[in-house]
Curated annotation (Swiss-Prot):
GO biological process: regulation of DNA-templated transcription
Record's protein name: Probable transcriptional regulatory protein Aflv_0709
Basic residues: compositionally biased ranges: 1-14
Family label: Belongs to the TACO1 family.
Highest rank taxon of the organism: Bacteria
Keywords associated with the record: Cytoplasm, DNA-binding, Transcription, Transcription regulation
Keyword Transcription: yes
Amino acid sequence: MAGHSKWKNIQRRKNAQDAKRGKLFMKLAKEIYVAAKMGGGDPTTNATLRLAIEKAKSANMPNENIERAIKKATGNQEHTHYEEIRYEGYGPGGVAVMVICLTDNKNRTASNVRVAFSKNGGNLGETGCVSYLFDRKGLIVIARENLHIDEDDMLLQAIEAGADEMETTEDSFEIYTSPEQFEQVKNTLAAQGFTFATAEITMIPQTYTTLTGDDLTKMLKLIDMLEDDDDVQEIYHNLDESMLE
């Protein structure tokens, strides 16, 4: 992971989301709805819902939107059934791609994802064809701007909180945890006064791929096309983050 800052990828994703805020809120509301429907509407006892709410708040989603999604999921009205589906494949130049969807129509979603890959030099594969190239980890990113702590002290606090490792970039401290320790580390650091640019359980590539020219152009178009799909919740890939600048 060394040298591959997640900060650029996060910034790009947030900038793209800012430009499509209505679509983003719809996707976040769907995630909250599914979490509340599956595990109940109380975030203190539903960890999946708690993480979905925190994710929505970090995107500045209004509280009334969050509450509406929970109420819809826990009310007596007819429910929409969403199914989580994971698609795996390769983008141009052999970039590994995983696409996580929440859909009420598997045929529509499969068709849209397949078209996005085929139009941009990629190929969908079987389940498991690229997931082994990623590790599921907690990621906590703390921006270094206006932060008065050096790398050694930050590393010590992160490790004492239960983190596995930390990377330092020019812009940020990037703290990695096991999925099981994620909430403990996040809550401990928050109690110490740290605020987070992002805090999520995500998929971290084991290795990275660099692209140039037409392959890079097509890969960026593939990411954009998938992000525009209402059914797509998350896109994980191992394109080198420097390619996203």
